[in-house]
From Swiss-Prot:
Protein name as catalogued: Ras-related protein Rab-10
Lineage summary: Eukaryota, Metazoa, Chordata, Craniata, Vertebrata
Organism domain of life: Eukaryota
Binding-site residues for Mg(2+), renumbered to this chain: 23, 41, 64
Annotated source species: Homo sapiens (Human)
Gene name of the encoded protein: RAB10
Function summary: The small GTPases Rab are key regulators of intracellular membrane trafficking, from the formation of transport vesicles to their fusion with membranes. Rabs cycle between an inactive GDP-bound form and an active GTP-bound form that is able to recruit to membranes different set of downstream effectors directly responsible for vesicle formation, movement, tethering and fusion. That Rab is mainly involved in the biosynthetic transport of proteins from the Golgi to the plasma membrane. Regulates, for instance, SLC2A4/GLUT4 glucose transporter-enriched vesicles delivery to the plasma membrane.
Cross-link annotation Glycyl lysine isopeptide (Lys-Gly) (interchain with G-Cter in ubiquitin), location: 102, 136, 154
PTM-bearing positions, type N6-acetyllysine: 102
Molecular function via GO: cadherin binding involved in cell-cell adhesion; G protein activity; GDP binding; GTP binding; myosin V binding
Amino acid sequence: MAKKTYDLLFKLLLIGDSGVGKTCVLFRFSDDAFNTTFISTIGIDFKIKTVELQGKKIKLQIWDTAGQERFHTITTSYYRGAMGIMLVYDITNGKSFENISKWLRNIDEHANEDVERMLLGNKCDMDDKRVVPKGKGEQIAREHGIRFFETSAKANINIEKAFLTLAEDILRKTPVKEPNSENVDISSGGGVTGWKSKCC
């Protein structure tokens, strides 16, 4: 059996309208790269990045979902095992911000009750084209008791900070397991979070 190279596995999900920059946010964090020619995600895709927090190696499995309505049933099935969900809107697109309330409802309907949520106002490098004031993002985050960052995948603003903050928030409420605990086997099951036996 291959030696496990991490202590914990956190499944994260990026959701939001098509075109808000979810894939760019993910690639900036996972590969420190930015590409202006991404095509829309078809269905679902994921990346893995291992980070170290509080002396623990944490493998982040980050799922990038399609924002289009026609993929709705595919993507909602991925909400269940998610431990952290980033809701992304585009500060230059008012409709993408209005739809955040719809995405929040999707989380309530499909995700685990204790999932950590975070709101990201992306493309903050395009301030000259801004239509969503920062205060509006802060307000909706306050109303729902979630963290908020304005980010830019292009200019690499707050991307790493957002992911690490979300991971820290999850870590804070993750029960500490004894190192010799025998009931944990993450090596099987293709990387899904089978070890978190909260839901049935």
